[in-house]
Design a protein with these regions (language model features):
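Flexible, acidic/Gly-rich N-terminal and inter-domain linker regions that tether
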Residues: 1-93
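Conserved, mostly hydrophobic/aromatic
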Residues: 46, 110, 273
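Conserved catalytic-core segments centered on acid/base and nucleophilic motifs
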Residues: 100-101, 112-113, 145-148, 152-154, ...
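A short mid-domain helix/strand-loop element embedded in enzyme catalytic domains
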Residues: 103-115, 131, 136-141, 194
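Mobile, glycine- and charge-enriched loop segments
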Residues: 112, 141, 227-253, 333-336, ...
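Conserved AdoMet/S-adenosylmethionine-binding subsite of the radical SAM
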Residues: 131-139, 154-306
């Protein structure tokens, strides 16, 4: 089965899900209420990683809708993406980086997604005219890197990705190009079955301007032999891979799991990059967010089990005002630093806030 057919064959309805798990009438009703607002898509490969006998299976929690999504606590745009949109599908929050929203589709719709407002839904936020995006980037010489995101850009046809890379390669002030993707966890056949994609990536990853994949692995169970094959092919075709993990309640909120994940990533050739505090997104916050106090304890305990390479990541909140690193907690204060800032005057700023046991975001701190 080719990757396109595998993607089309994903599970997206209650009836299809019932091929894998028995649902009560009440569960069907609750699930139906969720799907009216936020659709489901799970690749059958990703479903195969779930242990259905384990009610607390971490991949099940990340991929399968639940009644907890009926909780409306939080906001849909927690990072100010609307404010940072310059033209449709083009966000320019940090002076050196432009983010392109290339699609609203993914191989699997993660239930904790911070772009829940647009994934799998009709939206006006997605890039439609790539020429306009390229022109914007060309006219802003301060930009030195591009993040092609979505949705998942690797769900796009290889010809579309080729168009992106062809135009971006002509912009001389770019130092590197990144693809934000979960495809290695959710549908690794996208990599292993498309030789044209691999040739395209290799031909555009030069000694002085590399192609990066920024992956998202949140649990060691997502790393399989098929993942290893995909990672190995990317590395052999000159792609550099780094990873962003989201700290998620009921998935990786214990130090053993977090340490095992980061150590495994290093061993297969993926560089730990960020661990993100789960954002207070509507229909996500109360189901997935870990309090900052507990999150810091988990991360610090996990670091004791890691090599230096494993703990190169930064534990951050991706806030409206910038990426805020959690430096430490002492005497009921949490110490924070702007690792990235929308206002460049804030860059590098260190500050402290009073911490409590339940605070999960900057606005929750005193």
């Amino acid at each position: 089965m080719g990757w396109q057919k595998e993607l089309r064959n994903s599970v997206s309805t209650i009836e299809e899900l019932k091929e894998y798990v028995k649902l009560s009438a009440k569960e069907e009703t609750e699930l139906g209420s969720v799907l009216k607002v936020h659709p489901m898509r799970v690749s059958r490969y990703y479903l195969s990683l779930i242990d259905w006998n384990n009610p607390n299976d971490p991949i099940k929690k990340m991929a399968i809708p639940s009644k907890e999504e009926l909780d409306l606590t939080g906001l849909y745009d927690t990072s100010g993406e609307h404010e940072n949109t310059k033209i449709k599908g083009v966000q320019h929050k940090y002076s050196r980086t432009v983010l392109l929203l290339s699609t609203n589709n993914c191989a699997t719709y993660c239930r904790y997604c911070f772009r829940k407002r647009l994934i799998g839904l009709p939206t006006e936020e997605i890039l439609h005219r790539f020429n306009s995006a390229a022109k914007y980037i060309q006219n802003h010489k301060e930009i030195n890197n591009i993040l092609i995101s979505g949705g998942d850009p690797l769900t796009l046809p290889t010809k579309t990705i080729e168009k992106f890379l062809t135009q971006l390669s002509q912009i001389k002030h770019l130092d590197f190009i990144r693809f934000g993707t979960k495809i290695l966890a959710a549908l690794p056949s996208r990599i292993t079955e498309d030789k044209n994609l691999l040739r395209l990536l290799e031909s555009n990853s030069h000694t002085d301007r590399r192609i990066f994949f920024v992956t998202q692995f949140n649990h060691p169970n997502e790393i399989t032999d098929k993942t290893l094959a995909a990672v190995d092919l990317l590395l052999k075709h000159k792609v550099i891979i780094s990873n962003q993990t989201v700290l998620l309640k009921g998935v990786n909120d214990d130090y053993e799991t977090m340490a095992a994940l980061q150590n495994k990533l290093v061993s297969i050739g993926i560089n730990p990059y960020y661990i993100f505090q789960c954002r207070p997104v509507k229909r996500v916050k109360n189901n997935f967010q870990v309090p900052l106090y507990k999150g810091y304890e988990i991360i610090e305990a996990a670091k004791k089990e890691m090599s230096g390479h494993g703990k190169r990541f930064r534990y951050v909140m991706s806030h409206n005002t910038g990426k805020i690193e959690i430096l430490g907690i002492m005497d009921n204060y949490i110490y924070l630093k702007y690792h990235q800032a929308r206002n460049e005057k804030d860059l590098g700023k260190i500050f402290k806030k009073k911490i409590n046991q339940t605070a999960g975001w900057l606005e929750d701190l005193e």
